[in-house]
């Protein structure tokens, strides 16, 4: 049976790593995405790399998902090359780091998670829902049926309801116009999602976000990545307890389920890295040296 000193040695105190700066980075990026100068400088047509609605009056850049889906409604076949270029560039550089550090809708979910309510974990297999939304609502629906289809991504987008729907409905109310059911439907979806945010961490990011799912595919080969150092692992499970996405970091480092919030780096065995990767798979932990037999 291990004595108290051995238990203490295996459970080090969390380090104050780079993750403590994440709320400040999210706030700074929020100011960038909602900068009024964006429209004045004609930046509104340039796609960003985060999930938000370009219909918001304060939006500075375009939503990459909305732009990509909009190409499907054209009378001729076309590829959103600028969107593809931006996402491949960002994904190849940092992967889903933008989800954890720059996305305004992710920031909203982080703030909601701070409310002290009972929390439950979403099963990992539900993460494939992101690719159902990406292939179905972003690609197939607009190409086959156009923007008028009820399941067109912009017609059910919760970010659109929050960032643009509030303004548009208020404007219609002031002008005396009717509230369209298409916009009201988005508010129902947003309401369900807001309630879910109180009881589980980042439900949109885990289950439905098409952009997060796409960027997560780059995690295994992006220049920025996480490195697991087996020789420094004390099997304290600190990295697991710090991961709100439910990733077994020491076994599945750089998985597509990771938003790279870097909370797991408070454990000394995991650290951010850039450039060449020494080992894509998580190496086996070193077993402690056997005690010498007393004679």
Language-model regions: role of each:
Residues 1-250, 256-295:
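Non-ligating segments of multi-cofactor redox enzymes
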């Amino acid at each position: 049976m291990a004595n108290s000193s051995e238990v203490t040695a295996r459970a080090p105190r969390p380090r104050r790593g780079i993750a403590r700066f994440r709320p400040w980075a999210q706030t700074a990026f929020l100011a960038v995405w909602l900068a009024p100068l964006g429209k004045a400088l004609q930046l509104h047509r340039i796609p960003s790399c985060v999930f938000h609605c370009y219909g918001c009056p304060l939006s500075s850049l375009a939503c990459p998902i909305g732009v990509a889906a909009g190409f499907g409604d054209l009378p001729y076949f076309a590829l959103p090359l600028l969107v593809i270029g931006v996402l491949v560039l960002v994904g190849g550089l940092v992967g889903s780091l933008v989800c954890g550090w720059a996305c305004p809708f992710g920031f909203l979910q982080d703030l909601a998670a701070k409310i002290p309510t009972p929390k439950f974990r979403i099963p990992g297999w539900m993460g494939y829902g992101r690719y159902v939304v990406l292939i179905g609502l972003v690609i197939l629906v607009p190409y086959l049926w156009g923007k008028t289809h009820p399941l067109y991504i912009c017609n059910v987008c919760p970010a659109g309801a929050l960032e643009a729907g509030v303004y548009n409905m208020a404007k219609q109310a002031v002008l005396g116009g009717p509230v369209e059911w298409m916009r009201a439907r988005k508010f129902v979806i947003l309401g369900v999602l807001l309630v879910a945010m109180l009881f589980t961490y980042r439900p949109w990011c885990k289950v439905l976000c098409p952009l997060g799912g796409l960027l997560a595919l780059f995690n295994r080969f992006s220049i920025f990545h996480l490195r697991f150092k087996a020789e420094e692992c004390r099997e304290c499970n600190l990295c697991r307890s710090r991961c709100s996405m439910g990733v077994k970091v020491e076994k599945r480092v750089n998985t597509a389920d990771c938003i790279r919030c870097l909370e797991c780096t408070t454990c000394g065995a995991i650290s951010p890295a850039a450039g060449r990767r020494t080992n894509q798979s998580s190496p086996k932990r070193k077993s402690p040296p056997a005690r010498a037999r007393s004679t």
